[in-house]
Design a protein with these regions (language model features):
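NTP-dependent small-molecule kinase module
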Residues: 2-4, 28-30, 150-217
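Pre-Walker A (Motif I) flank of P-loop NTPase domains
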Residues: 5-9
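A glycine- and Lys/Arg-enriched "phosphate-lid" helix/loop adjacent to the NTP-binding pocket
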Residues: 106, 110-177
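P-loop (Walker A) phosphate-binding loop of NTP-binding proteins
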Residues: 15
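Hydrophobic positions on the alpha1 helix immediately C-terminal to the Walker A/P-loop
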Residues: 23
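Conserved lysine of the Walker
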Residues: 20
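Hydrophobic anchor at the beta1->P-loop junction of P-loop NTPases
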Residues: 12
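ATP-dependent small-molecule kinase phosphotransfer cores
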Residues: 38-134
């Protein structure tokens, strides 16, 4: 027992190119001196897929499979669920129990948007699978970095696309619409990701101060 209160679980969601990784790193650097965290608590950076050793192997299968081995939509959904179950059980829950804070680049919202809205798999089935994979764990706060698809495509430029990114603009448009719907249904906090990175970072910091009850300095 650490004597610390339960940690916080914060998630960044959004389409590719929205700046999730950049903003997660910025927030992780700011949090220890923000006044939000109790003394002695640490920040854990993570991501999905790939937040565990097993998850890294699953990430390779999902995003860069060998020729001829790409999973079908249902298999894709199950692989993401396996990644999340391992992530929750071996990384997130232990860290929270120790009083630490966990920042994750994607969580269950991405599955609902990509495999539900994007692939067209039944949302009720996805929700039940998520309940099993997470054991009912939900984020304390989800920041949705809202970026139009055209801006996402421009930012990605000529960078090689992974298998999900290469699924086509119509697919990615459905994913973006899914994120917008989920943000309303799940009461995520929207951040305008078309702004400069430092403006986005300040918006994220402001939301955390507002939601966690600490006034801006």
């Amino acid at each position: 027992m650490t004597g610390l209160p339960r940690g916080r679980f914060l998630v960044f969601e959004g389409i590719d190119g929205s700046g999730k990784t950049t903003q997660l790193e910025a927030l992780a650097a700011w949090l220890p001196t923000s006044g939000l965290m109790p003394s002695g608590a640490s920040v854990h950076r993570s991501r999905e897929p790939g937040g565990t050793a097993l998850g890294l192997a699953l990430r390779q299968l999902l995003l860069h499979p060998p020729d001829g081995t790409a999973p079908c939509p249902t298999a894709e959904l199950l692989l993401y669920a396996a990644d999340r179950a391992q992530h929750v059980e071996t990384v997130i829950r232990p860290a929270l129990a120790a009083g630490d804070w966990v920042l994750s680049d994607r969580f269950s919202g991405s599955t609902a948007a990509y495999q539900g809205d994007g692939r067209g798999l039944p949302h009720l089935c996805i929700a039940e699978l998520e309940r099993i994979a997470t054991g009912g764990l939900t984020p304390d706060l989800t920041l949705w970095l809202d970026l139009p698809l055209a801006a996402s495509l421009r930012r990605r430029g000529h960078r090689p696309a992974d298998r999900i990114e290469a699924s086509g603009e119509a697919f990615l448009a459905r994913v973006g619409e899914g994120f917008a719907r989920l943000a309303q249904e799940r009461r995520w906090w929207r951040v305008d990701a078309t702004q400069a990175p430092e403006q986005v970072a300040e918006a994220c910091r402001s939301l955390l101060r507002q939601q966690l009850g600490v006034a801006a300095p």
